[in-house]
Amino acid sequence: MPANYTCTRPDGDNTDFRYFIYAVTYTVILVPGLIGNILALWVFYGYMKETKRAVIFMINLAIADLLQVLSLPLRIFYYLNHDWPFGPGLCMFCFYLKYVNMYASIYFLVCISVRRFWFLMYPFRFHDCKQKYDLYISIAGWLIICLACVLFPLLRTSDDTSGNRTKCFVDLPTRNVNLAQSVVMMTIGELIGFVTPLLIVLYCTWKTVLSLQDKYPMAQDLGEKQKALKMILTCAGVFLICFAPYHFSFPLDFLVKSNEIKSCLARRVILIFHSVALCLASLNSCLDPVIYYFSTNEFRRRLSRQDLHDSIQLHAKSFVSNHTASTMTPELC
């Protein structure tokens, strides 16, 4: 096929394939992501007062993942039925929620890595660091991310329909934007939203690895460093597996949708690659609970059989006690 071949419908042959990938991926993610993140919130709530090691950031990361997971049934419906009957408002909100989840996940993964790194490298300086500061950092992060991600739905339109079919998600048409402005926005977004966070996580990983090379480390200190390194490495792994492919394919996909790339073969390859990258970007919703389990001792302890049994009994006794007290209290007229 000639390189300068222009497609009238470059995605026509790949639409069913891409829809199938999305539907299968989101179905696979849905149940593990829902159960895993609900369990994560329950566990973190239980030991929130016991530790200062980034638990507030982990709670916010689990909330971000849970919001994404709760929108998956609507995405699955669309990709199975090839139509969106729920109105443009809900479509744009779910589309917007995808990016909020992604960049909130990136933000809180960075916060977790930096917090563990600081506790490791400067234990006395940050030993008495109060959780309220982590709460303020989390609130500020949510506000910035929610405002910044408004740009994504603003660059799409929900007015286009094909016959009786209403488009949503990846099929939303892109608004006409000047190419120079698009390049500037994408460059700023890539640098702030991915490159800088990735460099921060890689720096924390590198410095933690160097700290393990001390000639005479104390046994307790060595154990703390190994646990911190495990957590930071898993954060870096999520970045590279889930978010790197998307941030590489996103500018290319934008150029395809803006008709700046004319080669039919190149357009089809980019659309398929971007579809796979989108699926990988959603995978973090069920990967994060696995990370908590394998990199956090408290998480494993809390989910152990005995601790789980004791916690359920404690919650049951608390519920019965509160219910009994409320029924014995006379009603006020």
Curated annotation (Swiss-Prot):
Q: Name one Pfam family in it.
A: 7tm_1
- Function per UniProt: G-protein-coupled receptor of lysophosphatidylserine (LysoPS) that plays different roles in immune response. Plays a negative role in regulatory T-cell accumulation and homeostasis. Under inflammatory conditions where LysoPS production increases, contributes to the down-regulation of regulatory T-cell activity to favor effector response. Mediates the suppression of IL-2 production in activated T-lymphocytes leading to inhibition of growth, proliferation and differentiation of T-cells.
Give one GO biological process term: negative regulation of interleukin-2 production
Glycosylated sites: N4, N164
Membership in a protein family = Belongs to the G-protein coupled receptor 1 family.
Where the protein is mainly located, per its record? membrane
Q: Which InterPro entries match?
A: GPCR_Rhodpsn, GPCR_Rhodpsn_7TM, GPR174_7tmA
GO CC annotations, alphabetized: centriolar satellite; intracellular membrane-bounded organelle; plasma membrane
Which gene carries the instructions for this protein?
A: GPR174
Q: What is the effect of changing Y22A?
A: Substantially reduced receptor activity
Which ranges of this chain reside in the Extracellular compartment per its record? 1-27, 75-91, 156-182, 253-269
Disulfide bonding pattern of the chain: C91-C168
Places the protein is found: Cell membrane
**UniProt entry keywords in alphabetical sequence:** Cell membrane, Disulfide bond, G-protein coupled receptor, Glycoprotein, Membrane, Receptor, Transducer, Transmembrane, Transmembrane helix
GO molecular function terms noted in the UniProt entry = bioactive lipid receptor activity; G protein-coupled receptor activity
Which membrane topology term applies here? Multi-pass membrane protein
**Cytoplasmic compartment residues:** 49-53, 113-134, 204-231, 291-333
- Transmembrane parts of this sequence: 28-48, 54-74, 92-112, 135-155, 183-203, 232-252, 270-290
Quote the protein name from its UniProt record: Probable G-protein coupled receptor 174
Q: Which CDD domains does the annotation name?
A: 7tmA_GPR174-like
Subunit-level organization? Interacts with GNA13. Interacts with CCL21.
